[in-house]
Structure formats: C-alpha cells, structure tokens
A protein has these predicted regions:
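Positively charged n-region of N-terminal signal peptides that target proteins for export
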Residues: 1-4
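Bacterial N-terminal signal peptides
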Residues: 6-15
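Short S/T/G/P-rich N-terminal loop/turn motif that feeds into the first structured element of a domain
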Residues: 19-240
Length: 240
C-alpha cells in the first residue's frame, strides 16, 4: 500500500488534485492533525491560510487545508485546519515544531480563537479529496470497533460499485483531551452539496443498492452520536 506521502506528491502534478473525479489511491497509513478554531471572520482566515504557509512549512506537513462548518454549528465561525502526515511519528512531532497556542504570527491570532488540537489515525483506507463533507462524531465500544470499521469498508465498496464518487473515512483520536477522548470521526465526502444530496436521496428512497445496509449495520454498533456536521473543505497547501 502506498504511503500518504506518495499520494500527496502525486497530487502536486495533477490539475484536479482536490476534485472528486480525480481518483487518488486510498491508504490507512500516516496520520492527520486538526486544529479546531473559532474564526471571527472565516473568509479572512481562509485567505490568510492560502497566502501564508509558514505554519504548514514549520510543522512539516505534506498537505493541509481547512473545513468550515456549514450546518450543525456548535458556535459561530466553527472550523478546523487539517494537516496530513506520512506517519504518526511525523504528525505527533509536528506539535513540537510549531505551537499554535503560542503563534508568532499575529495575523492568525487576530482572526481566530483556538479551541484545541488533536491527532487522528485513519482506521480504513481513505482518499484525500476534500469537498462537501459530513462529519459524525461517534462513540463505539472498543469491542465493536473492528466490526464497525469492517462494515464501513463494505459501505465504501457498495458506494463505488453503484457508481457513486463518495469517499468514506473512519478516524481514531490520539491526544484529543476530554473533547475527543474515545471518539471516532466518521466522514462522508462528495464533490459538491448537490452531489452529496443525490446520494442521500437514493439512500433514503432505497432505489439503489449502494451498500446502505452496511452503513446501518455499522451505526447499529454506535453507543452515542456526539455531533453531526456538514462542512465545506478544501486543500490550500502541498509541500514542495
């Protein structure tokens, strides 16, 4: 299986690197970090992320971007900055290379309030292709996590077999404090809101065999759904 670094390097030469029609290789290697923030002006913060890559370079990330909450907000300006790493070693080491709590960049501090940071391990093969995304934070007993992930893998296969370009992911938190402790992040990603909606239309109508039974089987193992968001995500940085 190719490493996340190999995948990101390949994306550097693709015009449609973050478009859903560009078929990237899925991997469960590597890791991600997310910096959860409250942005006073999300547009200004996103523009700053695009124009100033100093923080990304400092951490050594191979790719980075943002996710802006569109529905299900816990608070106004809810979003996070994500960074991809080729190993969990690199992901965890990044926290010592750049401390966002003590950011030397006054521009960042002036437009956002940091909530917390966390590292994530993908538990199933995941395609990095940001778009319009649903993020569901769930609690699954440790004894059921293997079955949960297995059903999500089958749900992903069902979507692909039915011709849907929707990517699924399951991520386990590492060092997430009291907010993310014992939490799994489930992500479902389409290119646009309309594309996402069409998948949901077919799922609820039952008109297409799309692996929905495996999604339901996975969620039957969930003890609690902590939160459920729709987010607009994009990649803004790729390492040279």
């Amino acid at each position: 299986m190719k490493s996340l670094l190999t995948i990101i390097c390949a994306l550097m030469f693709a015009h449609s690197a973050i478009a859903m029609h560009h078929e990237n290789t899925a991997t469960d290697e590597g890791g991600f970090t997310t910096l959860m923030v409250k942005a006073d002006d999300p547009s200004a913060y996103i523009d700053l992320l695009k124009s100033d890559d100093s923080a990304f370079k400092a951490t050594g990330t191979v790719a980075a971007g943002y996710c802006l909450t569109r529905t299900g907000h816990d608070h106004q300006g809810q979003m996070f900055v994500w960074s991809a790493f080729s190993s969990l070693s690199d992901a965890l080491a990044s926290s010592a290379k750049y401390d966002p709590m003590d950011s030397p960049n006054a521009g960042f501090s002036s437009v956002r309030e940091i909530k917390y940071a966390v590292t994530w391990k993908p538990l199933m093969p995941f395609k990095l292709a940001p778009g319009f995304e649903r993020m569901i934070r769930v609690v699954v007993p440790q004894s059921d996590r293997e079955a949960f992930v297995s059903n999500m893998v089958k749900a992903q296969e069902g979507l692909y077999d039915a011709g849907y370009k929707m990517n699924l992911g399951v991520f386990e938190s590492i060092g997430g404090g009291k907010v993310e402790a014992n939490i799994l992040h489930v992500r479902a990603i389409a290119s646009t809101p309309s594309d996402f909606g069409r998948v949901l239309d077919d799922f609820y109508s039952g008109s297409v065999e799309m692996g929905g039974k495996y999604w339901l089987a996975a969620f039957a193992l969930v003890d609690k759904i902590e939160s459920d968001y729709m987010q607009e995500c994009a990649q803004v940085y790729t390492a040279e």
